[in-house]
């Protein structure tokens, strides 16, 4: 599912991708988004070591983490946006990491232990999409009641039949 591109594809490789290749860290460059932010695809099993490498490289701020359903019955994706914040940076360096996983066993190692701000964001992705973040200290529903069945933002989710009691005014 993931191939490492060679150095002759520098058109879609940014500085971080070249640095990761130099240090033998597996990834797949996906190019740049409309704002010029480098996007990389990472395998779930490579994520813990790569997360630490990103932190060592200087990405000290997790700007956001989200998830989405690629297609009904297909893959789920967990997306991380990191920023390298320094004292004298007018234009901080940013990176986007995408991890695609099968919906049958959607497990990704948690990065809570590197960036504490991942706490509620990973919990929301768990609550809405059912992605299990391994080694998360408190992975439980955050928006839906604990009794809720299923993962409401998956494209194959079937809304349960229930009727709300309404006040008669």
Swiss-Prot record:
Reactions mediated catalytically: a plastoquinone + NADH + (n+1) H(+)(in) = a plastoquinol + NAD(+) + n H(+)(out); a plastoquinone + NADPH + (n+1) H(+)(in) = a plastoquinol + NADP(+) + n H(+)(out)
Broad enzyme group: translocase
Pfam families per UniProt: Complex1_30kDa (PF00329)
Keywords from the named record: Chloroplast, Membrane, NAD, NADP, Plastid, Plastoquinone, Quinone, Thylakoid, Translocase, Transport
GO molecular function, one term: quinone binding
InterPro entries the record matches: NADH_DH_suC, NADH_quin_OxRdtase_su_C/D-like, NADH_UbQ_OxRdtase_30kDa_su, NADH_UbQ_OxRdtase_CS
Binding partners and assembly: NDH is composed of at least 16 different subunits, 5 of which are encoded in the nucleus.
EC nos: 7.1.1.-
Protein name: NAD(P)H-quinone oxidoreductase subunit J, chloroplastic
Organism whose genome encodes this protein: Marchantia polymorpha (Common liverwort)
UniProt-annotated location(s): Plastid, Chloroplast thylakoid membrane
S-S bridge residues: none
């Amino acid at each position: 599912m993931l191939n490492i591109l060679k150095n002759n594809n520098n058109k879609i490789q940014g500085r971080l991708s070249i640095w990761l290749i130099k240090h033998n860290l597996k990834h797949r460059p996906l190019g740049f988004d409309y704002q010029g932010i480098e996007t990389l695809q990472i395998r779930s099993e490579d994520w813990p070591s790569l997360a630490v490498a990103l932190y060592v490289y200087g990405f000290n701020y997790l700007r956001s983490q989200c998830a989405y359903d690629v297609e009904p019955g297909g893959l789920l994706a967990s997306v991380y946006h990191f920023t390298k914040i320094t004292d004298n940076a007018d234009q901080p360096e940013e990176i986007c990491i995408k991890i695609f996983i099968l919906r049958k066993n959607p497990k990704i190692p948690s990065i809570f232990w590197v960036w504490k701000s991942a706490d509620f964001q990973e919990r929301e992705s768990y609550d809405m999409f059912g992605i299990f973040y391994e080694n998360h200290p408190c992975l439980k529903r955050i928006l839906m009641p604990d009794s809720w069945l299923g993962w409401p933002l998956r494209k194959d989710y079937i809304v349960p039949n229930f009727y709300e009691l309404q006040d008669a005014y």
